[in-house]
Each structure stands twice: as C-alpha cells, then as structure tokens.
Regions:
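Residue-level signal for mature regions of secreted extracellular proteins and peptides
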Residues: 19-20, 300
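N-terminal leader/presequence-like segments
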Residues: 11-13, 20, 67-68, 113
C-alpha cells in the first residue's frame, strides 16, 4: 500500500512523483486565490486528505470528458486543510469541503478554481446544507457547546465577504440535516432521538441564533433523513430504527402544514439511506439477525455471512413494491444511493463484510461495500444485482452527465465504472487519474 492506495509499478510511481513535483512547482509562486482556471467544460472535484513529502491534501480537478487529471495542482487551503465530504451549491458557484480531521469548513470558488476562505468549526460535522443563493451554510455539529444546554447545534456560516460563523442554533446532538427546495425550512435529525426538529432559517439572527422557539415533532423512530415534496408541504422521513438503536425501520410522512407525524410503512430490510426517482423511493439498510442472511431475492453466491437489503417503495400509496424482505445486497451502514445511466443504481456502504481474494495465482471471490442494481429488472422474476470485485468503504459516487460513466471512491481509491457493463473500466493501476494519498469524495461541478 502507498498512502492507502495499492502500490504502483516503480516506473509509474516515478512518473507520478515527477508529475506531482512539476504541478507543485507550477503553482508554488501563486497564492490560493489565483484566478487562473483550467478552461475545462466538464469538471469533477475529488477530495484527497493526505499530505506528505510526495503529495498534498486538496481538491483534485478531473476532466470528466476525457477521464484525465487537469494539468493543475490540487486546490489547497491554508492551515493544513485536509478535505473530506464535499457539498455543492444549487447554483454551482461554490463547493464546500469539510475536514473532520481538523474541524474546518473550506470554501472553494468553482469559477476561479480557488480557495476563498476557511472557517473553523466547533467540532466535526457529517452534514452541511447551503441556502439556495449560496450566501449561507449550515453545519450540523453534534458536539457544539451551548451555554446552559446540552451540546449540539447548527452552526451558521456566512459565505459572502469574509466567511465566518454568525450564529449557532442549539439542537442537541444534531447529526444530519436536509433543506426544503425553497430554503424555508431545515429538518434536523439528532442522535438517539425519536423527534424531528424544524428550523426556519429566516428567523435566525446574526450574533444571536434562533429568535423563535423551534418546532419539535415527535412520533418517529430514530429519524436520520428526509425528502421534501415538490410543494414543500410534506416530507418523507427515513426512520433508521434498530440500526440506530430504535425499534422499527420505516418511511413516515411528516405533515409540514400541521407539523405532525403521519402515516408510515415498515421496512423490514432496514433504512439508513434513500433516493427518490419520480414516484418511487429506493431505500437501503441492514436488517437485524436473523433476517440479515445472504439468502433471498436477487441473492448472489458469496462467502459473506451477513447481507443488507434494497427495498422499493411506491410513494403515493406508501407501500413496498419489491419483495417485502427486500433484495439482497452488501451489508454495512449504507450511506450512498446514486442513480446512473441505463437505469443502474449504485449502492455504497461503510464497515461492510469485505471478502478479500486469495493471493495469486489462486482465484476466488472479491467483494466490498459496493453493489449495483439494475432498476429495469427489479420488477421482473430475474432481478439483476452486481457485486463488483473491489474492497473497502464507498465514500463517494458521481455519475457523469450524458455519459455511461460513474466516478467512485472505494477504499480510498478512485474508480471508473461503465454502466453498460457494470464493470470497472479504469482503476488507479491503469488509468490517467492516479491519486496519491487517500481519495474521500467526488463531485461534478459542471452540468
């Protein structure tokens, strides 16, 4: 392993080091606020969080039309910033990157391809949302200190002028958030809670925080995420249930007119992540024993002893249209569902049962935290699911617009998949996108 990435050949490693050195020298005399741009028409950013004598942490620019790295040094930030998860503004003007290694929010201008500021956070954050106009960011920090209150809060950061924290809204143990389409509400989800907190951003006063009481809606079961309806009058809340210390996994309606919990559908297969496509909701999770076996609809032959499930829900009727137990997929804690071309659905998890292949020349199963489901086949008697031969946590998935290509991060390595075959087409051992260090997330910033 080389900095968390499979070893390269000596010649290729030397070539990579020379390339990195050349790129670094090209950018060494300019500041992080350089206005020089690559001029690429379709760009993708990859966050890389390792700094050493041969590589530097930052955002790497990829030419997504040619699948090659841009001839530019990684976009870095001051203070040893080590970027992880990224968040794209609705208008695509900014990309925010969070470093949980040093509790910092980095702000990057997509037009100038430069860092325009960093803001220290009071703790790690796994969820950030931006206002529709990209003027404000909200970071969920479960450990944020609050005088006279339990820790946890939504940290409000201005992104205009000099970036900085303007307020903190106390929400104990807040972990995840989702914003309504019109920006009028933020739903906040806290650890070990059976409630959803509704936060109206317009009532947050700079320097003071929330100036009206927050609305807390009870009646859920360890809620962790939600999806707003098109008119923002209701939301579908994902109840994590037993995977998060609760009782029953389900999808439940939140009435935002009366602020009450509504109807729900139990999901035996588990719910930790979801994706809406038209009137269909796909959810993934890992059920509790004895229901987490690797036998059932769509099951593949595997040495893994525990598996997760993919369930399909019709939203208008709030009923499961897949087999009630769900389709068999990889286990772990599922965090990513991403639709791709040709009806392919990429499913990513962390802390799954990795099956490592035997040493060569022997052959055997290899399996990690990625599954691909052909949604066109899920309503047939022969559902098609694929477990690509790779290992590690899946931390980023990005389908490329108008292409049958998906960029993906698995085990800290950059991968490229072809949706016509569901196979890896280029990996770090063979592609022109060598990433020294550890890749974390991937985001397309042009559409």
């Amino acid at each position: 392993m080389l900095l968390g990435v499979p070893c390269l050949s000596r010649f290729k490693l030397l070539l990579c080091l020379m390339t990195v050195a050349f790129l670094a020298s090209c950018g060494s005399s300019s500041s992080n606020n350089s206005t020089h741009t690559t001029g690429l028409r379709l760009r993708v950013l990859v966050s890389q969080d390792v700094s050493s004598n041969i590589t530097s942490a930052g955002l790497i620019i990829i030419d997504a039309l040619k699948d090659v790295r841009a001839v530019a040094a990684p976009i870095s930030a001051s203070g040893g910033f080590q970027p992880g998860n990224m968040y794209l503004a609705d208008n695509r003007s900014l990309t925010l990157a969070v470093s949980n290694i040093n509790a910092t929010l980095g702000i990057f201008n997509n037009k100038t391809e430069a860092n325009v500021g960093t803001v220290g956070l009071p703790g790690a954050s796994d969820s950030v949302v931006l206002s529709p106009d990209a003027s404000t960011a909200y970071a969920a920090v479960p450990t944020a200190a609050n005088a006279g209150s339990p820790p946890g809060g939504i940290v409000v950061v201005t992104l205009t002028g000099t970036p900085g924290i303007t307020a903190t809204v106390p929400v104990p143990s807040v972990r995840y958030m989702v914003r309504s389409g019109d920006g009028s509400r933020i739903l906040a989800f806290s650890d070990d809670s059976n409630s959803v907190t509704i936060v109206p951003p317009q009532s947050i006063i700079s320097g003071q925080g929330q100036n009206t009481p927050l609305t807390v809606v009870t009646g859920f079961d360890r809620p962790i995420f939600g999806f707003f309806s098109a008119d923002n009058s209701q939301a579908w809340v994902l109840n994590c249930g037993p995977e998060c210390g609760g009782t029953e996994a389900s999808v439940q309606v939140l009435d935002l007119i009366h602020n009450t919990a509504g109807a729900k559908v139990a999901v035996p297969g588990g719910v930790t992540i979801g994706l809406i496509s038209n009137q269909t909701l796909y959810v993934a999770g890992t059920p509790q024993p004895p229901d987490n076996t690797c036998l059932g609809p769509g099951a593949l032959t595997t040495a893994a002893t525990t598996c997760g499930r993919l369930s399909v829900i019709d939203l208008p009727s709030l009923t499961i249209t897949s087999p009630p137990s769900g389709f068999v997929i990889q286990d772990g804690y599922h965090t990513l569902l991403s639709p791709a071309s040709n009806g392919q659905l990429f499913i990513g998890s962390r802390n799954c049962s990795n099956i490592v292949p035997p040493a060569l020349p022997a052959t055997g199963e290899q399996r990690g935290c990625l599954f691909i489901a052909d949604t066109n086949s899920l309503s047939t008697s022969n559902p098609r699911l694929v477990a690509p031969p790779d290992n590690g946590d899946v931390t980023g998935i990005q389908p490329i617009t108008n292409r049958t290509i998906v960029y993906l991060i698995e085990g800290g390595a950059f991968r490229i998949y072809d949706t016509t075959t569901d196979q890896m087409t280029l990996g770090e051992a063979t592609s022109a996108i060598d990433i020294l260090g550890q890749a974390v997330d991937v985001k397309q910033i042009d559409f």
